Amino acid sequence: ERDMTATKGLEGIVATTSAISSIIDGALTYRGINIDELAEHATFEETIYLLWHGKLPNRAELKSLMDELAANAALPDELLTQLRTYPPGANSMAALRSAVSALALYDEEANDMSPEANLRKAVKLQAKLPTIVAAFARIREGKEPIQPKSGVSIAHNFLYMLTGKDPDEVAVKALDKALVLHADHELNASTFAARVTVATLSDIYSGVTSAIGALKGPLHGGANEAVMIMLDEIGSIENVEKYISDKLERKEKIMGFGHRVYKNGDPRAKHLQKMSRELGERAGNLK
């Protein structure tokens, strides 16, 4: 008789192996380099190169990557027109998911599955994702999108496209570090979803669209959004205790605490806490 035992959620199941990132004894590494070292000494662009090519770039390789990203950051006019048709109250992740899916329509190499073409498409996606997010953020506020500029980092460009002003270096450094810390995380739900999609020999745009759809969920990346909603609901520091007590009494989850993988603390948290304090000091608000 066949064994019909099922493991819910694939817990403990080895779906594949990876040389890209790993979590061993609570330590996160990208290509064998500890996240602490990368957070303190590497830029997001250097981290992208590391994840894609297995090594940190030299000066020429980094410049080449940054030039390619800058050359591909602008969006097709047709996609900007499409973004303007989205409801202002639409979920930003849903808008991003739809826009990434639409990008495939404007890429003549969309169905070229060669490694060389996929790398070119990865550059296009990496370059355009921040532009999409910034453009939709401005459109929903009734403002015109701002074209990306060349010669600056992804973090700098994103903040510039959001505000129309060159950002404070502290803010750029903070965002850059946050991007490094979140660049990869083993075979999480969104990565798994992307791999399942491309395993059918579907294109990279379909894979990334699947990944964004999974990331949107409140049990994955959507937890970040849930934390922000919770903070808005709390309003001020005086309301924290009652808010949390009421949540616990109703047996509801307190978002932003605990992690399925890290049982003794997330190694990325200390960098985010330090960064938050620096930004708070800059803004004159440490609450």
Q: Which sequence ranges carry the predicted segments?
A:
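Hydrophobic alpha-helical bundle cores within soluble ligand-binding/oligomerization subdomains
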Residues: 2-287
